[in-house]
Amino acid sequence: MIVGFLVIRQSDQRRWGRYQIERDMYFQMYPYQLDPLLPFSVVVPLGYIAQRKLQNELMLKFNQEVIYITALVQREEARQNQTYVVQVRIHDHKVGELEPKYAEKLCLNLAQTDFFIGRPISLQAEITVFQKSEIECGCRIKLNLPPDPQSADEYVIRNNKDDAKRI
């Protein structure tokens, strides 16, 4: 009897693990979309290393104009001092995180969606390259998230045939 229970429990754990992997792959293939008509109002704080990584990845130079690129925002697991952490990724590289207060309001607003369990939101990012000194340049990222995160659910568009309508 105990052996049967252990076999069933182990089988259930494997099935749950496979489900989580398949769910994550599905979420990456079909992220939520954000209404592209929103203004670029949310600035992502970038550290020096993130700026250098972004400049190398996208081969950014100072003489370029503003660049528009697709980015993903995705909720991460909670940390000791932060319950809601939302990362910003470009080309599968984490470049920064949303500010904690904005991230908390955004997560609470989208709590009834798959975003809360890890489904990313695809949106446009505006990258501006500026010159820090004669030999060094930096960059700034603005996202077209709504200025008020408590209205975000009005702008999220689901991206598959089952969820073709707005949230």
Residue ranges: model-predicted function:
Residues 1-167:
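Conserved active-site motif detector
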